[in-house]
């Protein structure tokens, strides 16, 4: 395909590689908690979006991860893919986040280690990126919203709840459901949101 990188192709999954990847995501790992892809080019770690310059709705999660990694593990730049690298459409990173709901990252490993006269070993950068991946895997539980209902009050026709989020991800589609002992749904709330960094009422 001779289209520029901002063109997603003739149709969705027009390339066999992206089609196979979407099948894998949907049929093998539909409930994954983390998705990582690797690429060579420059040294940077990218999160969604590649297609749009706006920050994702879970920007608090990605900024938290960036700050933790840069403060304690590596000085690898961590950016929104569109702003940090260039606009890029049709990536598994954007599909995994936007459609499947995974936290997703692309690790770009620069190719300077392959140049003649380089003083950096190929394994140095890869080792550092492996440390970052290890951090992401060891803390994977926190990359989702983990809601705890601290208090529920029912007064007349109103239900009030206090919710804490133990994870670092926001959610916009939490609901409160009420079932009887037979498992029959008697009532459910509208969707409500809980940010990653607050206690909601």
What residue spans do the PLM features occupy?
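Conserved aromatic beta-strand anchor motif in extracellular beta-sandwich/beta-rich domains
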Residues: 176-180
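Metallocarboxypeptidase
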Residues: 1-155
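Intrinsically disordered, low-complexity Pro/Gly/Ser/Thr-rich segments with frequent PxxP/GP/PP motifs
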Residues: 181-201
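Solvent-exposed, conformationally flexible loop/turn segments
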Residues: 90, 154-156, 195-201
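Short acidic/proline- and small/hydrophobic-mixed sequence motifs that coincide with surface turns
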Residues: 168-173
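Short amphipathic, basic-aromatic surface patches that mediate peripheral association
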Residues: 163-167
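Structural beta-strand segments of beta-rich domains
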Residues: 157-161
């Amino acid at each position: 395909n001779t289209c520029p990188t901002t063109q997603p192709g003739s149709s969705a999954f027009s390339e066999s590689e992206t089609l196979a990847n979407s099948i894998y995501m949907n049929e093998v790992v539909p409930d994954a908690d983390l998705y990582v892809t690797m690429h060579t080019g420059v040294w940077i770690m990218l999160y969604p979006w590649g297609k749009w310059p706006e920050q994702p709705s879970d920007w608090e999660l990605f900024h938290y991860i960036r700050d933790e990694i840069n403060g304690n593990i590596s000085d690898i730049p961590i950016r929104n893919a569109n702003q940090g690298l260039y606009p890029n459409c049709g990536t598994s990173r954007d599909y995994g986040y936007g459609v499947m709901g995974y936290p997703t990252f692309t690790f770009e490993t620069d190719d300077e280690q392959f140049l003649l006269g380089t003083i950096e070993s190929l394994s140095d950068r890869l080792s550092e990126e492996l440390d970052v991946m290890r951090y992401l895997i060891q803390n994977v539980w926190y990359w989702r919203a983990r809601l705890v209902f601290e208090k529920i009050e029912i007064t007349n026709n109103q239900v009030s709840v206090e919710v804490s989020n133990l994870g670092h991800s926001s959610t916009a589609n939490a609901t409160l459901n009420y079932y009887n002992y037979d498992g029959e749904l008697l009532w459910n709330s509208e969707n409500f949101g809980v940010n990653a960094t607050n206690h909601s009422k």
